[in-house]
Curated annotation (Swiss-Prot):
Entry's EC annotation: 1.2.4.2
Entry protein name: 2-oxoglutarate dehydrogenase E1 component
Domain of life: Bacteria
Protein source organism: Bacillus cereus (strain ATCC 10987 / NRS 248)
Name of a matching Pfam family: OxoGdeHyase_C
Key words, A-Z: Glycolysis, Oxidoreductase, Thiamine pyrophosphate
GO cellular component: cytosol; oxoglutarate dehydrogenase complex
Family per similarity comment: Belongs to the alpha-ketoglutarate dehydrogenase family.
Length: 955
């Protein structure tokens, strides 16, 4: 008997949950117990009861003409439909996915539903009634249940029910239910897999015995991580992927380096012995890092395909590498050689992130990075996440490290499919890897593999884990390795015999011994002890002429003030832009935002791409930039920098999510992988940048010294004390200055639009060279439109960036100057504004002011040459608006002492030490600021001093 044609049997198109709904509606129709869907009511009136027919089979699998009307089994049908969906949704709760535990058991929701249905009930229901795509050989609902339990409750378990897209969800279920993922491997691939596991285990055990007590953070217990990465990398290569980016912590890193990235064993052993070996490529900076933090780049290939694999350098700050590697991938995906936005091709590269089971739910950077995955400015076409799940974080059990059942549960909130797999089932692990790469390449979205194993030793090899997990480690001690388990399986299946397995083991051991024999004795020469900064770094950025011809600037400005005909610019913005029309003419003045746009355009015309991101970067936090215009009628956007002539480089400016750490990491990674690009991150206020402090500490400031990893990232950090309270005043320059050493970056606080123009162009000029380094700018807020920060066209068309500037009209009588005031940024402008105001009388002949535009590296020669002009100088004073324990004072003090020598005093004027960067009372702030200025200029003026704390001292 065959299924009726759907033209005469409309019920044939209803299956699964839809079928259950139809049957419920028919029951209501017959009993009159409730309202029925009008369309279904019409079908019931025409065709009668839902009727389902399937092939007739005999024996135990009998399934005959079946209708709720002639069987009275409506409730049973509904229960079967519900059971099928429960197996799909909750089968993972019964699966054997933890090698250290028995398969899940006990009365679960699933088991209760199964107990309510007898085998006879299930045999009476045709398979396709509840499973439309039931494969051949599946005839009854009983067959369906057996098959789905086999799929969903073994060593592979799936969580797909949270996926919102029905097409994706259907594809995932079809992939796992069709059994195409679990096709038997060829004997050749099985043998290769055993060899790989033997190499991984042999390598770890060799290190364990040869370098006793040395830290290596063994992978043992989750050995299948290496074959899983192999599978993803090579399947990606088959799909045409050119770059695979991997981010991971120290656990298992050495084995991944040795096997996935093909770092020679001999080079690994040399690092353990502290020996030099011929052919080893240095992949670290002058200070270096421990071996399990280092990365590597390698072209990986087999007989058919090849791809470049990059394992990112990584600190011990878990998961902070995640956004960095995402930035790598985006940079590799984009073509930046045309004007307009970069052209992205997500098939060119993808990311694999290896997480820890404690760190994945524990570190907030994970969630921040996951949130980037579908944002236009940051998406990379899908990341494959692998949780190397050994069920413990150092000494902390999982029940103390997360509030969820699985360590992967965070991913559900980001619509990411999840596969849990038993790390002791190698072929199941490869199936998970295969599903992950197929999904990523098809849907361009993230996928997560929860690789559940154990940790055979302690957190490191000097740690005894039995102290804190005695029962677990009794089990682990007696538990066979995955290599041994798989070897037994292959032997039982007749793929290999015992002698052949032993031959594989011996081959690996001989290779390890042979490579170890190549390693010379430890190098104890002075060269390995003394750290020397490379000359090109120590030399610093040399003076560079960065002016742009005036005619070019005028042409650029004209283009910046143009937009398509019919494009309706917001009236207020239009007025702001129109004020810039004559800025480059005689008597014109250039404000900060225009100087920036002119710098951007000129940099683009010289072939350097630009990427700028931040929480409000298109408009600018202070409504000053307006680099992306919005049509008031259509909300379409337009950026004049995309349409300027003579540009062969991309420009992108994006508003970022409310994240600092992930976005800073991403932009750093983008810049590392696209060194020719001017990459800038702008904080909404500099105060908020400290939520990315780990990125500044571990990557931006120290990446080159540790790993030889160059970056030209620009940080724009709005800074300045304006009475707006402790969260809107300070970018904490003291922290960047504390990290400043070995010419690792430039820290500047500028006082004019021209200076900003020139320093951006200087930074662009060193990109991709050995002279490159990050640029940390304390950018203005109130100074954005301040008259004293405006510049003339000639100041942009001529000259270069000046690390120090002298206050105009001061110091004209050198022999009378007694006090030299040094300051930076807004404080310097406040001093200049007070002088210009003419409110008070000063003995200006006795004062000279120098603005320190570049705090680090400090322009010592320039300042020293100024000091030498003043033969009667009595004191050098540092003036700042920040409290004494913040700002630049503690950085400047030893510099001033050295500059002053024995005969000249040094001093400080500013706020006293405080625990909070700024007060919250704007009136108190104003009074304090006036007092600081008064003392700095030595004004004989009666200020309200009774309740104000201003510190003035000299040595």
């Amino acid at each position: 008997m065959t299924r009726k044609n759907t033209t005469t049997n409309p019920w044939a198109k209803f299956h699964g949950p839809n079928l259950g709904y139809v049957i419920e509606q028919y029951d209501l129709y017959v009993t009159g117990a409730g309202s029925v869907d009008p369309e279904l009511q019409e079908l019931f009136e025409i065709f009668g009861a839902p009727s389902f027919q399937d092939d007739v089979v005999t024996g135990d699998n009998t399934a005959t003409h079946f209708s709720p009307q002639n069987t009275g089994n409506i409730e049973k049908i509904l229960k079967v439909v519900q059971l099928v969906e429960q197996i799909r949704s909750f089968g993972h709760t019964l699966a054997h996915i933890n090698p250290m535990e028995d398969a899940a058991n006990g009365q679960s929701l699933l088991e209760k539903a199964m107990n309510e249905l007898s085998d006879a009930d299930l045999k009476a229901i045709p398979a396709k009634t509840v499973w439309q795509d039931a494969p051949e050989g599946i005839h009854t609902a009983l067959d369906v249940i057996h098959r789905l339990k086999e799929v969903y409750t073994q060593t592979l378990a799936y969580e797909f029910s949270h996926i919102q897209d029905s097409e994706e969800r259907a594809w995932l279920h079809q992939m796992v239910e069709s059994n195409s993922l679990r096709q038997p491997l060829s004997n050749k691939k099985r043998t290769a897999l055993l060899k790989r596991l033997t190499a991984v285990e042999g390598f770890e055990q060799f290190l364990h015995k040869t370098f006793v007590g040395q830290k290596r953070f063994s992978i043992e217990g989750v050995d299948m991580l290496v074959p899983v990465l192999d599978e993803i990398v090579l399947e990606g290569a088959k799909n045409g992927v050119e770059d695979v980016m991997i981010g991971m912590a120290h656990r298992g890193r050495l084995s991944v380096l040795a096997h996935v990235l093909e770092k020679p064993y001999s080079h690994m052993f040399a690092e353990f012995k502290h020996a030099k070996i011929e052919g080893a490529v240095a992949n670290s900076g002058w200070t270096g890092d421990v071996k399990y933090h280092l990365g590597r780049e390698q072209v990986v290939s087999n007989e058919e395909v090849s791809t470049r694999v990059t394992l990112a350098n990584n600190p011990s700050h878990l998961e902070f590498v995640n956004p960095v590697v995402e930035g790598f991938a985006r940079a590799a995906q984009e073509n930046r050689k045309k004007s307009g936005l970069p052209e992205q091709d997500t098939s060119k590269s993808f990311v694999i992130l290896v997480h820890g089971d404690a760190a994945f739910p524990g570190q907030g950077i994970v969630s921040e990075t996951l949130n980037l995955s579908r944002l236009n400015a940051y998406q990379t076409g899908g990341t494959i996440h692998v949780i190397a799940n050994n069920a413990v974080g150092f000494t902390t059990d999982s029940y103390d490290s997360r509030s969820t059942k699985y360590s992967s549960d965070l991913a559900k909130g980001f619509d990411i499919p999840i596969v849990h797999v038993n790390a002791d089932d190698p072929e199941a692990c490869l199936a998970a890897a295969n599903l992950a790469i197929q999904y990523r390449m098809l849907f361009k979205k993230d996928f997560l593999i929860d690789l559940i194993g154990y940790r055979r030793y302690g957190h490191n090899e000097m740690d005894d884990p039995a102290v804190t997990q005695p029962q677990v480690y009794k089990k682990i001690k007696n538990h066979p390795t995955v290599r041994a388990i798989y070897a037994d399986q292959l032997q039982a299946a007749g793929v290999l015999n015992a002698d052949e397995i032993e031959t594989i083991t011996q081959f690996i051991q001989e290779q390890l011994k042979s490579d170890y024999a190549q390693v010379p004795p430890a190098d104890t020469s002075d060269a390995t002890i003394h750290v020397k900064v490379p000359d090109v770094v120590a030399k610093g950025i040399q003076p560079i002429d960065t002016g742009v011809e005036l005619d070019s600037l005028r042409a650029i400005n004209e283009g910046l003030l143009s937009w398509p005909e019919g494009f309706n610019v917001y009236p207020k913005v239009k007025k702001i832009l129109e004020r810039r029309k004559d800025a480059l003419e005689e008597n014109g003045k250039i404000e900060w935002a225009l100087a920036e746009s002119l710098a951007f355009a000129s940099i683009l015309q010289e072939g350097t791409p630009i990427r700028l991101t931040g929480q409000d970067s298109q408009r600018g936090t202070f409504a000053h930039r307006h680099i992306v215009l919005h049509d008031t009628d259509t909300n379409e956007t337009y950026s004049p920098l995309h349409r300027l002539p003579n540009i062969n480089a991309s420009f992108s400016v994006h508003n970022s999510p409310l994240s600092e750490a992930a976005v800073v990491g991403y932009e750093y990674g983008y810049n590392v992988f696209a060194p020719e690009t001017l990459v800038m991150w702008e904080a909404q206020y500099g105060d908020f940048s400290n939520t990315a402090q780990a990125l500044f500490d571990q990557y931006v400031s120290a990446g080159r010294a540790k790993w030889g990893q160059k970056s030209g990232l620009v940080l724009l950090l709005p800074h300045g004390y304006e009475g707006q309270g402790p969260e809107h005043s300070s970018a904490r320059p003291e922290r960047f200055l504390q990290l400043a050493a070995e010419n690792n970056w430039t820290v500047a606080n500028l006082t004019s639009a021209a200076q900003y123009f020139h320093i951006l162009r200087r930074q662009a000029s060193v990109l991709g060279t050995e002279a490159v380094r990050p640029l940390v700018l304390m950018t203005p807020k109130s100074l954005l439109r301040h008259p004293l920060t405006l510049s003339t066209a000639s100041q942009l068309s001529e000259g270069r960036f000046q690390p120090a500037l002298e206050q105009e009209n001061l110091g004209t009588k050198p022999n009378k100057v007694k006090r030299l005031v040094l300051s930076t940024g807004k404080m310097a402008i406040d001093l200049a504004a007070e002088i210009e105001s003419g409110k008070h009388e000063y003995n200006l002949d006795e004062i000279h002011i120098v603005r320190i535009e570049q705090l680090y590296p400090f322009p010592a020669e320039k300042v020293q040459s100024i000091i030498k002009r003043f033969k009667n100088l009595e004191e050098i004073i540092w003036v700042q608006e920040e409290p004494r324990n913040m700002g630049a004072w503690h950085y400047m003090a030893p510099i001033l002492f050295e500059l002053a020598g024995d005969k000249v005093k040094t001093g400080y004027i500013g706020r006293p030490d405080r625990s909070s960067p700024s007060g919250g009372d704007p009136f108190a702030h104003k009074a304090e600021q006036e007092l600081i200025v008064a003392h700095a200029l030595d004004v004989k003026y009666n200020f309200r001093q009774d309740k104000l704390e201003i510190e003035v001292f000299s040595n």
